[in-house]
Amino acid sequence: GKGKLVKDPCKSCHGSGTIAVKKTLEANVPAGIDDDQGFRLSGMGNAGTNGGPAGDVIVAVTVRPSEVFQRDENNIYVVFPITYSQDVLGDTITVPSIDGKVEVNVPEGTQSGTTFRLRGKGVQYVNGRGRGDMYVKCEVEIPKKLSRAQREALKKFEGTLKEDNYEKRKGF
């Protein structure tokens, strides 16, 4: 102890010199912080002893997974469904990003599963110097039901194609 006995301890601290108080703190979470990382709130912790400076609060971060994006360090990945026509004819698609919407040019004849890299569209580095990349993987979504007219049109179209239209089928 301190070598002193408190004869009339106060009702708040009972002679300990400190009072336990629950307190809500506001903090700016650093951009780019990842799961299981943390940051310090200096001077926001418990009161110091004998009038010394207050301690620090260490904040441990848990990042909630996104339903749209996958994250690997500072890179963001998204799988985006495109139509057969967009795949064959090419198109500009609008894809969600962490900053809102972004346009991606899908060239004519793009194969299903092709991934496009968008530089600097990922998560900001914690040190604030640059950002990761965003990767957009295009997957062709095949319609589950076709009308009779759609079926006939597709068969007619298929009849116009030759083996030369298919690179991967050559040799089988």
List the predicted regions and their residue ranges.
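Short, intrinsically disordered, charge-biased short linear motifs at domain edges
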Residues: 1
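Charged, often glycine-enriched C-terminal and inter-domain segments
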Residues: 4, 8-12, 18-172
